[in-house]
Structure formats: C-alpha cells, structure tokens
Amino acid sequence: MGIRLRNITGLLPKGLLGFGGKSLIYRSLEYLKNEGISRAVVVTGFQDSFYHQHLQQNEDIPELEFIHSKQFEDTGSMHSLFVASNYLQEDFLLLESDLLYESRALPSVINFEGPDVVLASGETGSGDEVYIYGEKYEKQTGIINSSSVLTGKIAAISKNPFPSLSVQGELVGISKISLKLLNRMCELHKVNSEFPCDRHYEEYISDLCSMTKIPFLRVGDLVWTEIDNQSHYERALKEILPRLIK
C-alpha cells in the first residue's frame, strides 16, 4: 500500500510513481515488451482502478490482464501471487512493482540456464535490504558489490542475519519462476493462509530452499532501487535515474 510513502504518493499506488516521465510499472512493461514478452498479468490491490486508468493498452507494452487481490490489506506479496496462479499456465517472470532498474536486469534473468532463478545485486546501502544467503558453486573471491556475475544455490532469503551463512547479494525483486516451483509455493501458502497473512513470496522461496535447489544470479554492479520509503525515493531521483538516462 506504500504507507511509508503516503506523503509522496498521496492516493497513488507505488507502482504508479513517475520517474523521467514514466511510471515505475510502465517502464517495467516496456522492458518486458522489448524482451519479447507478449502478455503480462498485473495483480492490483490498493486503488486498483488507478492501474486500469493508467495502463491503457498500446503497442509499447505487453497485452495486460488485471487480477485484483481483494484481501490486499491483510496479506503480503505471496497472496498476490497465489491469486494470480490460476492465470499462469507456463514458467514466468515475477517482478515487484516498486522497482527502478536498468533494463539489462531482465535479459540476465531470462537467459539464465534453468527454470528458476532469483536476481541479486551487490551491496546498495539503501536501507531495508533483503539479503540472499547461499553457497557459491565455484570458489570466487571478492565482495558482493564487485562487478562480477555469480551464481549459486540459495540457502535463505531474509532481512535477518544468519551467522552460519554467507551473504551473496541483495534481493532485487525480479525472478524467473517455473510452474513447478509456483505450485510448491502455493501449496505452502494454503497451509499458512490464515488471515491476516503478511508473508511475502521470497519467504516461501526461502522455506523451500532446504528441500529443492533454487539458484540466485548476482549481478554485482546492477543499477537499481526499490522505492518503499522517503530515502529510497530520494535515492531514486538523485542517484539511480541519472544513471539510467545518461
């Protein structure tokens, strides 16, 4: 709902915040279309009619299908994904709506070899980070904000520290999800769906990591930010947007 941004967004959902003349979600949809994605499912919650009004169908974005999560006030992002699951018939890309990022993030995920992958970045220092913990497939040195691209198996995803594990990167909010993984996530959600249910999709991925191999892909120098509070918004304007439009 973007409560921490209410002084900026007013009644606008976060995904409709404008940067460089485009809303966050429209920019993402353009990126998707440029990568050959022809259909997108948009799950709405707060002020869902605003999305319908803003996202008029045109040739620059994929064909849109809107799904409204009626219990958005009492649920986290996993329930939004659960609501959309009946409309997903093939492996898909999962994108959070409050992201400002460079376009190479998408082909990095799309071209990853394997049905599932969670995109990670190097250290951003933006605050409110969600960390991906895991083990590297290959022995490599260097800190997580290096320019290297690294892949590995996820051991956990959390804001909380795991002293026994190593931080491999920060969760970006862009993933490639197979129907097989989606079904397992939804099965877990059914078991834990007493309302209010504020768990997010990445928590279910984290839960499943002990039972199945789910990889991360870290692009150490990826330019991006989520926009979840005032400091994120200011960082997006002053640091991220200028690097995207230079």
Task: Label each region the model flagged.
Residues 11-27:
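Short catalytic helix/loop segments, enriched in acidic residues and glycine
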Residues 15, 63-65, 153, 213-215:
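Conserved beta-strand segments of alpha/beta enzyme cores
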Residues 59-131:
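Conserved beta-loop-beta/alpha segment of the NTase-like Rossmann-fold superfamily
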Residues 102-194:
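Conserved core of the sugar-phosphate nucleotidyltransferase
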Residues 1-10:
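N-terminal nucleotide-binding beta1-loop-alpha1 segment
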Residues 4, 50-53, 83, 104, ...:
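Phosphate- and divalent-cation-binding pockets in alpha/beta enzyme and binding domains
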Residues 168-246:
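Conserved alpha/beta core of the MobA/IspD/sugar-nucleotide pyrophosphorylase nucleotidyltransferase superfamily
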Residues 22-92, 193-195:
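Conserved N-terminal catalytic core of the sugar/cofactor nucleotidyltransferase
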